[in-house]
């Protein structure tokens, strides 16, 4: 790897970003799903900053969990004396396998499932830490408060305010589900949070068209009728989903694995789906405001089927695009990103397809 590392340093020359580190990850037998996602998260600037800050403030008394193992790995990379090389994320992978049997086998795993699990696990750890800190602060002020603090959450069935962690602040958006009764025209809106958007895909489409389909109006009729509270009965209705609060980091998962009933198994959709380097989010509640996003990472699935294959990642760092394939790290041209859109033909020799896209908000325009 020394040679490959120095090759990358030579390629970047005096353009090598000050203080940045580019390290490949060792593969522990089919852990490419994990390596590719971790590289994407490492180059997600707000995530890396918050994780390292949290680690610096809490490492003395922290018991080991996925958060401490991930922070330890990121800290290890950022504090390397060398600019390039290989690191073994052994402690993190061991902890992951210890906690979740799904990732224990040497079978091919799903990168999106892993990302989803990891973000939710980090949220849970941070929420528990916040609750513990609150309880400590309240009980330390006066001993007689202890009994009240323990009873408080149960009293009168009071709804507790949800805890907003730094993971929420980075990745969480809000969707609003609007349903319009076609008899009385009453609109019912229900909000739900998301950490990523999973989009259905079609051949020769784009992220913009996939997002439009995601927010398209659907008519509920026959056995799918909607119970209208105003009419007090089941009625035909129109339903649509819009983005009420766009996240700072928008994670898009392209649903490339589809269950084929006639085959009785999943099939990979190699469809060509164009994802732009700059994305305007238009399916928002406020239709007059376009939110602009910039692509900074792509997790790519390599292979023709869902149960085998490989994951790699493309990452944008300081205006350079890098290609991470386990231990290997190479610089690539920005134009090379479009080779991962997918295939126009069903049977193609190109099996490297964008699977998870990470965009950072540039704000409103």
UniProtKB/Swiss-Prot annotation:
Tissues expressed in: Constitutively and ubiquitously expressed.
Cross-referenced CDD domains: Peptidase_C19G
GO molecular function ontology, one term from the record: cysteine-type deubiquitinase activity
Gene Ontology cellular component annotations, sorted alphabetically: nucleus
Any one Gene Ontology BP term: proteolysis
Domain USP: 23-362
Catalytic activity: Thiol-dependent hydrolysis of ester, thioester, amide, peptide and isopeptide bonds formed by the C-terminal Gly of ubiquitin (a 76-residue protein attached to proteins as an intracellular targeting signal)
Result, substituting residue 32 to S: Loss of activity
Enzyme class name: hydrolase
Subcellular location: Nucleus
Protein name: Ubiquitin carboxyl-terminal hydrolase 4
Gene: UBP4
List of catalytic residues: 32, 310
Family: Belongs to the peptidase C19 family.
């Amino acid at each position: 790897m020394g040679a490959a590392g120095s090759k990358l340093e030579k390629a970047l020359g005096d353009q090598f970003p000050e203080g940045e580190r580019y390290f490949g990850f060792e593969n522990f037998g089919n852990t490419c799903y994990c390596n590719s996602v971790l590289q994407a998260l490492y180059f997600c600037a707000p995530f890396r900053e918050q994780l390292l800050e949290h680690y610096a403030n809490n490492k003395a008394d922290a018991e080991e969990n996925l958060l401490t193992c991930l922070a330890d790995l990121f800290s290890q990379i950022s504090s390397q004396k060398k600019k390039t090389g290989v690191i073994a994320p052994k402690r993190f992978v061991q902890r992951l396998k210890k906690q979740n049997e799904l990732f224990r086998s040497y079978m091919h795993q799903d990168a999106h499932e892993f990302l989803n699990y990891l973000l939710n696990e980090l949220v849970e750890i941070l929420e528990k830490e916040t609750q513990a800190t609150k309880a400590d602060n309240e009980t330390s002020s006066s001993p007689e408060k202890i009994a009240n603090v323990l009873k408080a959450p149960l009293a009168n069935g009071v709804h507790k305010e949800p805890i907003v962690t730094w993971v929420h602040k980075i990745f969480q958006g809000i969707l609003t589900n609007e349903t319009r009764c076609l008899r009385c025209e009453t609109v019912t809106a229900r909000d739900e949070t998301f950490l990523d958007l999973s989009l259905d895909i079609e051949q020769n489409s784009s992220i913009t068209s996939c997002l439009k389909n995601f927010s398209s109006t659907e008519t509920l009729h026959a056995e799918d009728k909607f119970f209208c509270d105003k009419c007090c009965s089941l009625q035909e209705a129109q339903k649509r989903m819009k983005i009420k609060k766009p996240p700072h980091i928008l994670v898009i998962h392209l649903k490339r694995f589809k269950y084929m009933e006639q085959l009785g198994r999943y099939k990979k959709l190699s469809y060509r789906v164009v994802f732009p380097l700059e994305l305007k989010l238009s399916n928002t509640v406020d239709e007059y405001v376009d939110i602009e996003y910039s692509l900074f990472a792509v997790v790519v699935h390599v292979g023709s089927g869902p149960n085998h294959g490989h994951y790699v990642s493309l990452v944008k760092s300081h205006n350079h695009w890098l290609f991470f394939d386990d231990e290997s790290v190479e610089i690539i041209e920005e134009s090379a990103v479009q080779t991962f859109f997918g295939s126009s033909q069903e049977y193609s020799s190109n099996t490297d397809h964008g699977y998870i896209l990470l965009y950072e908000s540039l704000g409103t325009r």
